[in-house]
């Protein structure tokens, strides 16, 4: 059985336009790069110039091209536009950096829309950057590019002005129902399949899948295996935190704390056969148990302001009698280790979408971020990016996404430690506000599966399963496709349309909403349909380009997509709102099936069929071993710092302290963030006459109320290497 994609390839006329600073205007990008190169001891270039490059393909005459160049692409006050490629400096070289095929190009998307609005013509656009190194050789220019500018995971580097002959276009391809031989595999072969197919499921999980399909007397289809891998990934299900843990202790010294006494006295903590303590579901019986205990109305002093915990995309607490606050925080470490800008941008973008997908859509009102990276002078292992570049780019990623969406970034922190050299900590957070009566949504059988926002591409495939594996020096090559590049403008328009649909009439136009993050449609639709099933028509998904397989469409983690459960009667009204806001709407199928199944179709060809009971409840819960080693604790848990004693007076000592990376000012980061947008910040990140860092930021989210929200954070990795010991430090 097969079907075909349509072809989208044709000849094109491509125009190149360069935009650079005008006469008498400072080249900020070029001079900034030159300062960094000189400060790091680089040599070669006497001057560096920067230009933005645009490629436009379409039915454009010279008048059109001149108008677009001068009125849209270039600022007539500070910039000049040049058609074609300007001369390479002599002596010197030119290095150009362009997005790889299939990588999201947000600036190009905005230009395409603007051209259509301005002159009524549809064009295709690609962008790039040109760097002219005066007095430098090509090898020196490429060296600067590799160190400061380009990431070959998502970008192509050219040692001369680049001119494409045509834009990439998807090719026609046959769609087949691909089966994966699994039923007869032994354990070694199951583990090999899991790794080679990038499923990253362990042996017990692969055995569970094998048993399920043996019960069906058929081999699994590719799209079914991928669905299980996404749904059962560490990122999506937090299986390590939810696992059963067998805990024992050894080599305890006098005075060391012991947890074994808890066995049998606390819910979920039982005594094992050989004296160990078994915790059944670590998350449920520790972190969640503490919260639910505080909420227990039968206990004195219980709290009543936790409105929704551990069930939605973000936890929800009461703000006042009519409104609630939610907050979502998330690490985006693995992607940021490979592509820091995209990793951080999609980290904060994902938290924004989680807040949008909480209850019946919360409005994001603030962003936070914490970055932990290695010191700039640390030795960088093979396959890792320089820490200074990682920090600059993760800051830029959060800055660009939050600022362009109009959400203030009001709080954060930075910490330097050599242990972050291989995998930085990129910890993003978003606070949202929503009416209390909209804290919960419920998917209804018969509702349409509606997708709003961005189009689907190959970016982000296997991002969820990638989070379940260990980073090595080959991951930049092997998992470049797992990195997503977001478009905050698309997400801003989507947010506006969703809030308009939420506030339309007496009740929202949708019954439930979630974001399309890790695992793409597979996780979003699978999560919403877990109790009732769904039928999905994958061929309906709007694509960035043709040629994607049904499996790629299903698991793509392309950004800025939200999934809604919408009654048929509300589709027309929702479509009207989306048209008003310039947002794409797609009807992907229907929630609810007679046998509670997930059915995946492509032009009526069944690509996959899974029981929701197995997809949602079939994940094995293994016993993980945990050992408290007193000897290890004595040797490694205490954190020591080398002596910083030095001769000299108090002023010299003070200057040395202020020069330390963990003490010095972070204003260069804070000042890049817009903390005034939305007009709610009462106490800013920097306070006082001299702009010192404040203890917390305070927001006034409702104009008619003086009730405020205080946001702060703490980081204390210097207390101990063992997190439990850290809680005991007075």
Question: Which role fits each region the language model picked out?
Answer:
Residues 58-63, 135-142, 565-572:
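Helix N-cap motif at beta-to-alpha junctions
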Residues 10-23, 50-55, 90-101, 129-131, ...:
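Short glycine-/aliphatic-rich beta-strand segments at the starts of folded cytosolic domains
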Residues 24-42, 66-69, 103-119, 526-541:
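Short amphipathic alpha-helix segments
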Residues 40, 46-50, 112, 117-134:
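Interaction-mediating elements
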Residues 78-124:
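Short, solvent-exposed interaction modules
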Residues 37-43, 69-79, 115-121, 143-156, ...:
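A common structural junction motif
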């Amino acid at each position: 059985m097969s079907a075909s994609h349509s072809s989208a390839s044709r000849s094109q006329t491509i125009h190149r336009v360069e935009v650079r600073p005008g006469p008498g205007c400072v080249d900020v990008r070029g001079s900034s790069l030159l300062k960094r190169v000189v400060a790091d001891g680089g040599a070669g270039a006497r001057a560096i110039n920067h230009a933005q490059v645009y490629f436009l393909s379409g039915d454009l005459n010279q008048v059109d091209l001149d108008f677009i160049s001068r009125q849209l692409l270039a600022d007539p006050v500070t910039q000049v536009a040049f058609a074609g490629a300007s001369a390479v400096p002599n002596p010197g070289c030119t290095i150009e950096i362009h997005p790889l095929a299939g990588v999201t190009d947000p600036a190009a998307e905005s230009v395409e829309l603007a051209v259509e609005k301005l002159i009524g013509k549809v064009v295709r656009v690609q962008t790039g950057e040109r760097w002219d190194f005066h007095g430098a050789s090509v090898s020196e220019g490429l060296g600067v590019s590799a160190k400061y500018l380009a990431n070959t995971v998502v970008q192509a580097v050219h040692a001369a002005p680049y001119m494409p002959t045509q834009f990439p276009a998807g090719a026609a391809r046959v769609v087949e129902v691909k089966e994966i031989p699994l039923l007869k595999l032994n354990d070694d072969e199951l583990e090999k399949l899991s790794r080679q197919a990038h499923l990253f499921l362990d042996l017990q999980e692969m055995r569970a899948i094998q048993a399920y399909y043996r019960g069906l007397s058929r081999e699994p289809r590719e799209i079914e295996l991928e669905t299980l891998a996404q749904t059962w990934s560490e990122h999506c299900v937090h299986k390590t935190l939810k696992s059963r843990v067998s805990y024992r202790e050894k080599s305890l010294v006098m005075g060391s704390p012991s947890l074994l006494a808890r066995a049998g006295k606390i819910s979920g903590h039982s005594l094992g056969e050989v004296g160990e303590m078994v915790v059944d579901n670590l998350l449920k019986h520790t972190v969640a148990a503490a919260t639910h205990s505080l909420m227990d109305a039968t206990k004195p002093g219980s709290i009543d302001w936790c409105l929704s915990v551990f069930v939605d995309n973000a936890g929800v607490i009461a703000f006042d009698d009519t409104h609630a606050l939610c907050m979502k925080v998330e690490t985006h470490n693995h992607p940021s280790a490979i592509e820091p800008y995209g990793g951080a941008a999609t980290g904060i973008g994902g938290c924004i979408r989680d807040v949008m997908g909480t209850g019946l859509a919360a409005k994001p009102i603030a962003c936070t971020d914490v970055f932990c990276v290695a010191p700039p002078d640390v030795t960088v292992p093979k396959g890792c990016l320089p820490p200074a570049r990682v920090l600059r780019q993760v800051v830029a990623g959060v800055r660009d996404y939050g600022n362009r969406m109009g959400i203030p970034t009001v709080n954060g922190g930075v910490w330097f430690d050599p242990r972050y050299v291989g995998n930085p900590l990129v910890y993003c957070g978003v606070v949202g506000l929503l009416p209390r009566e909209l804290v919960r949504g419920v998917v209804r059988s018969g509702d349409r599966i509606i997708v709003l926002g961005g189009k689907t591409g190959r970016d982000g495939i296997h991002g969820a399963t990638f989070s379940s594996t260990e980073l090595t020096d080959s991951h930049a090559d092997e998992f470049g496709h797992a990195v997503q590049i977001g478009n905050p403008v698309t997400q801003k328009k989507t947010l506006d349309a969703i809030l308009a649909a939420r506030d339309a009439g007496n009740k929202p136009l949708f019954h439930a909403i979630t974001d399309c993050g890790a695992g793409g449609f597979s996780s979003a639709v699978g999560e919403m349909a877990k109790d009732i099933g769904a039928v999905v028509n994958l061929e309906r998904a709007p694509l960035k380009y043709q040629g994607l397989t049904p499996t790629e469409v299903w698991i793509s983690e392309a950004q800025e997509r939200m999934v809604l459960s919408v009654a048929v009667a509300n589709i027309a009204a929702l479509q009207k709102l989306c048209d008003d806001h310039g947002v794409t709407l797609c009807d992907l199928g229907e929630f609810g099936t007679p046998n509670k199944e997930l059915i995946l179709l492509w032009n009526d060809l069944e690509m996959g069929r899974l029981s929701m009971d197995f997809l949602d409840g079939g994940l094995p819960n293994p016993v993980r071993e945990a050992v408290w080693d007193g000897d290890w604790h004595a040797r490694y848990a205490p954190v020591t710092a080398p002596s910083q004693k030095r001769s000299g007076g108090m002023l010299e000592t003070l200057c040395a302290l202020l020069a330390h990376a963990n003490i010095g000012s972070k204003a260069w980061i804070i000042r890049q963030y817009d903390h005034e947008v939305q007009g709610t910040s009462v106490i800013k990140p920097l306070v006082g006459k001299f702009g010192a860092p404040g203890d917390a930021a305070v927001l006034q989210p409702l104009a008619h109320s003086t009730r405020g929200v205080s946001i702060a954070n703490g980081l204390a990795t210097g207390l101990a290497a063992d997190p439990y010991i850290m809680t005991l430090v007075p």
